[in-house]
Amino acid sequence: ERHLQRFKYSGRWGLQPAHDRLRGEIEAELDAPLPPGVLELDSALEIPAYFASVDIHQHPGGIWSDAIAGYVYERGARSTTPLMQQHKDLHWKFTALVNERRRGSRILDMGCGFGKSTRPFWSENRDAQVTGVDIAAPCLRLAAQDAAAAQARNVRFLQRDCRKTGLPDASHDVVTSTMVIHEMPPPAIRETFAEAMRVLEPGGLMIHLDFIPPEDPFMRFMHFGHGRRNNEPYMEPMVRMDVKKTMRELGFRNVETIDFEEMPGALAARGERWRFPWTVVVGEK
């Protein structure tokens, strides 16, 4: 698994060399003019040491250090779960679940990356104002271009740290993330939850989609092994921390974790294939 991922990105015919040959065209595409207010970058933003110290997913140089990194990362993500492409995308399924619980009017997507998790929110909630924040400028540039190409008028992307977004107190009614908190060490997760509490209005909803394997030795062996092979060093510490206890300590109410069915039959008692242990983490202010 580790070597396959490395070759996928860095091999002779890997994603990085292939896109390096198209660098000029890609950079021109990412530099295309945008409507006012869609993208706000901060060149002075300090990249957290926990994030800069490891090439997450073995992405060469990380997804923040190269102008075309977001473009390459988006292409790489397409091959992560190919068997799921015959079903409704899990991001759209997750958005539907969030909307069932709370159809927000001011939605914050933390760690939005290249915008795949954000798109269903601004697409399905046309009357809402959606904000995506991330520390990786290359990803945000792609997210903004995709939104502009779709003529979206209710979304903006900001280069901010999830732990310190700089957004006003009580300014959102839904705060969400998808596959983000397992990329953070426990202290950063706690800070991110605290920031969500700060920017949520009273009664607001915090809801994250991530991975929490069941209390089964083999399942945890498989999950933690994947994390080690794929340069995801915080996957195991995140699982071992008491996420629900942390949320309650920060003041969240009605805290729960829910198994998430990413495609039909995924939660069957005897599945045919190993799967990521998709879990929804929920709390209210």
Where are the regions a protein language model picked out?
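A short glycine-rich, Lys/Arg-flanked "PGG" loop and its adjoining helix->strand segment in the class I
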Residues: 190-202
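Conserved glycine-rich SAM-binding loop
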Residues: 113
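A short acidic, Gly/Pro-enriched loop at the edge of an enzyme's catalytic core
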Residues: 163-175
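N-terminal auxiliary segments of SAM/dcSAM-dependent transferases
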Residues: 1-64
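Conserved SAM-binding loop and adjacent beta-strand
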Residues: 65-66, 77-93
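Conserved alpha-helix/loop element of class I SAM-dependent methyltransferases that forms part
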Residues: 72, 85-103
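Class I SAM-dependent methyltransferase SAM/SAH-binding core
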Residues: 108, 116-164
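C-terminal alpha-helical "lid/dimerization" subdomain adjacent to the S-adenosyl-L-methionine
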Residues: 207-267
